[in-house]
Amino acid sequence: MSRRQARERALQILFQVDVGGADPGEAFRLMDEGFGELKKYQEFARLLVGGTLENLAAIDRVIAGVSKDWNINRMANVDRNIIRMALYEIFFCEDIPYSVSVNEAVELGKTYGGEESGRFINGILGRIVESPEEYRPLIKGSAS
């Protein structure tokens, strides 16, 4: 399993919580069952899911700030959760270069989203990484 596969698992959990109303604790338990001995990637997936959910309100403020003409709830469910997870990486995972977070999100969008998902995700995240300090105030003091 790679970090990309860990991101895929994290996306599945975020989607279940967001769209299916799954309990995060139960979702984590189900996610953990699929990792077996691959603890390094399990920890990364848990970090992405836990961090994204913990900072969801702030992350959604950033998305709303960038996509002024799009209500976040009107975005495709998969795209919304990919963007949320990527923004968690961008603002909270200092060891991951922005370009990696954006590229991984675009690839997830191409795999799991609609025909235009990759382009849409790249557009949203691209605007943010061009000037992340513009959006950082929306993140500060953000635990929801």
Swiss-Prot record:
BP GO annotations: DNA-templated transcription termination; transcription antitermination
One term of GO molecular function: RNA binding
Role description: Involved in transcription antitermination. Required for transcription of ribosomal RNA (rRNA) genes. Binds specifically to the boxA antiterminator sequence of the ribosomal RNA (rrn) operons.
Cited SUPFAM superfamilies: NusB-like
GO cellular component: cytosol
Disulfide bonds: none
InterPro entries: NusB-like_sf, NusB_fam, NusB_RsmB_TIM44
Pfam families in the cross-refs: NusB (PF01029)
Gene3D superfamilies recorded: NusB-like (1.10.940.10)
Keywords (A to Z) from UniProt: RNA-binding, Transcription, Transcription antitermination, Transcription regulation
HAMAP family: NusB
Source species of the chain: Pelotomaculum thermopropionicum (strain DSM 13744 / JCM 10971 / SI)
Family classification: Belongs to the NusB family.
Name of the featured protein: Transcription antitermination protein NusB
